[in-house]
A protein has these predicted regions:
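Short S/T/G/P-rich N-terminal loop/turn motif that feeds into the first structured element of a domain
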Residues: 1-202
């Protein structure tokens, strides 16, 4: 099913949140149907079984409780350049809920304002790759309405980007905070495992 897999990434958390797990594995597929079929194929394959056995001392994955999301890049993910050649990056994920009376349309409008802020950033104030994405949970009973994810070249450029947002976000920041409430971010170092468009990772 690799032809329908859009990418795979690993995340090693650097946030001390006292949870029972310390890493994330993300698989992106062309559809939920393809994701479910691919997962079942992996579980039933000798290759998958052998891989799990070989690396059992390295990681234990909670596959039964995996979560599904619809993902979008609301802004060109390469507007600030390409990701590092070695596939490394840093990421922050915040669980967000829409405030009372706010809707998906309000979220869309505030993302337009955020995109406008990104458009007007002085290039001299930034360094390295940056992109952001929104994850909408498939589970209708999920506590969060969406996850807001920021992807940076490394932890240093993440800190620089956060400071720039705090200092110059202005009305876009005010409006975003008026639409949703987001948790403290879960911060990780990430790594590309599979990218069908890059021979080094496919």
């Amino acid at each position: 099913k690799t032809e329908s897999m859009l990418g795979a990434w690993g995340y090693a958390t650097v946030t001390d949140d006292n949870t029972s797990f310390n890493n994330w594995w993300e698989l992106s597929w062309s559809s939920k149907e393809e994701a479910d079929a691919g997962w079942q194929e992996w579980l039933g394959s000798e290759e998958g079984s052998a891989w799990g056995e070989k690396y059992s001392s390295v990681l234990q994955c909670d596959g039964e409780n995996r979560e599904g999301y619809d993902f979008i890049f609301p802004y060109n993910p390469y507007a600030f350049g390409d990701t590092p050649d070695d596939g490394s990056f840093s990421a922050s994920f915040s669980a967000c809920t829409l405030k009372e009376g706010k809707s998906q349309e309000d979220l869309s409008n505030v993302l337009i304002q955020y995109n406008s802020w990104l458009d007007n950033i002085d290039p001299s104030q930034t360094s390295g790759f940056y992109a952001y994405g929104i994850y909408f949970p498939d589970d209708a009973t999920a506590e969060e309405d969406f996850w807001f994810a920021n992807f940076h070249e490394n932890l240093e450029t993440m800190s620089e980007g956060n400071s720039l947002w705090q200092e110059t976000g202005g009305d876009a920041k005010i409006q975003m905070e008026a639409v949703s409430t987001c948790s403290a971010p879960e911060i990780s170092n990430g790594q590309v495992f599979f990218d069908p468009s890059d021979p080094d990772f496919s």
